From Swiss-Prot:
Keyword Oxidoreductase: yes
Name of this chain's protein: Dye-decolorizing peroxidase
PROSITE patterns given in the database record: DYP_PEROXIDASE
Swiss-Prot/TrEMBL catalytic activity: 2 a phenolic donor + H2O2 = 2 a phenolic radical donor + 2 H2O
Organism (species): Mycolicibacterium paratuberculosis (strain ATCC BAA-968 / K-10) (Mycobacterium paratuberculosis)
Subcellular location: Encapsulin nanocompartment; Cell membrane
Length: 354
């Protein structure tokens, strides 16, 4: 909303127009007990349908959420590299590229298909399901669902390995600066990047460990979620390899909204990793540390029990962009080359084992 205020200056009435900043999607909304993650590919010829449907997302959220506001329904729509130039003319996000597949000495982070990501969450699954259904119906005949995960809160925000997940999330101004693009890409200020991976856990191997051994894998105590002291924390502990700093030693953060999921009949126990960041380079350095090792070969011990089966990188534009997007590209317009070819080019980012 634009606020127009009448003031009197030097005897003259002047209208001062306050134009609000762009509205980001609800990246920083608190965790909820329920979530649905939808990954879609856009079929050939489906671009116009998807382009139109994306403009209706915020209206669908309002319409469904208004019926039961106490359930705090929200949704974040994100777009992948391969489909961006099929959907929008004009500028392209500076760091948008395909997910960087990693092949380490023992473990692999695969890249899997995905053009659109919908992160839908609420206090209960019913409104998530209703919104997901409406979104898919609005894109019927234009998209294919390639992955669908229904996540749930597990006790006090624990994963199915039994540890609290998301403790190190920033909050307040630090959360904003960790996720919102600024002057470095002014065409997309207020937007952010998001990585997703679906991990499946080997619960038989995990439960065979003692609690102390499990704590050494994670780097935290299991019951009360306290980080282990540096002198006892193993170098290959999960949290030790996820500390990323810049050249000045300042720790760089991402915002995780991970959710457990599972299917008992298939003995499937998993964690859906979803990490929002101002630049994809921070999350990519974390993944390099985990899968390739820091130093090389010192890989994340958690990967001996958790296998990544999907991987995607998407761009989460502002609400303003989605409500009024650039037009579709003209027929025959060649796709603009990505600003980066998928190489990590970390530059000033580095991992710090602690």
């Amino acid at each position: 909303m634009v606020n127009i205020v009448a003031v009197r200056r030097h005897g003259v009435h002047v209208r001062v127009i306050h134009v609000p900043p762009v509205q980001p999607q609800p990246i920083l909304a608190p965790l909820t007990p329920a979530a649905i993650f939808l990954v879609l590919t856009v079929d050939d010829g489906g671009e116009a349908t998807v382009h139109e449907a994306l403009q209706d997302i915020s209206g669908l959220v309002r319409a469904i959420g208004f019926r039961e506001p106490q359930k705090r329904l929200s949704a974040i729509a994100s777009i992948g590299s391969d489909v961006w130039d099929r959907l929008f003319s004009g500028p392209r996000p500076a760091e948008l590229h395909r997910f960087v597949e990693l092949h380490g000495p023992r473990h692999t982070a695969p890249a899997t298909p995905g053009d659109l990501l919908f992160h839908i969450r609420a206090e209960s699954l019913d409104v998530c399901f209703e919104l997901a259904d409406r979104i898919l119906k609005s894109m019927a005949g234009a998209v294919t669902v390639v992955d669908e995960v229904h996540g749930f809160r597990y006790f006090d925000n624990r994963d199915l390995l039994g540890f609290v997940d998301g403790t190190e999330n920033p909050d307040g101004a630090l959360a904003v600066s960790s996720t919102a693009i600024g002057d470095e890409d002014p065409d997309f200020a207020g937007s952010c990047y998001v990585h997703v991976q679906k991990y499946l856990h080997d619960m038989s191997a995990w439960t065979a460990l003692s609690v102390t051994e499990q704590e050494n894998v994670i780097g935290r105590t299991k019951l009360d979620d306290i980080e282990l002291d540096d002198d006892v924390k193993p170098a290959d502990a999960h949290i030790a390899l996820n500390v990323i700093t810049d050249d000045d030693g300042t720790e760089l953060k991402i915002v995780r909204h991970n959710m457990p999921f599972g299917e008992l009949g298939k003995s499937e126990y998993g964690t859906y990793f979803i990490g929002y960041s101002r630049t994809p380079r921070v999350t990519e350095q974390m993944l390099r540390n985990m899968f390739l090792g820091d130093p090389p070969g010192n890989t994340d011990r958690i990967l001996d029990f958790s296998t990544a089966v999907t991987g995607g990188l998407f761009f989460s534009p502002t609400v303003d962009f989605l409500d009024d997007p650039p037009p579709l590209p003209a027929p025959g317009t060649p796709a603009a080359p990505p600003a980066r070819n998928g190489s990590l080019s970390i530059g000033s980012l580095k991992g710090t084992t602690r």
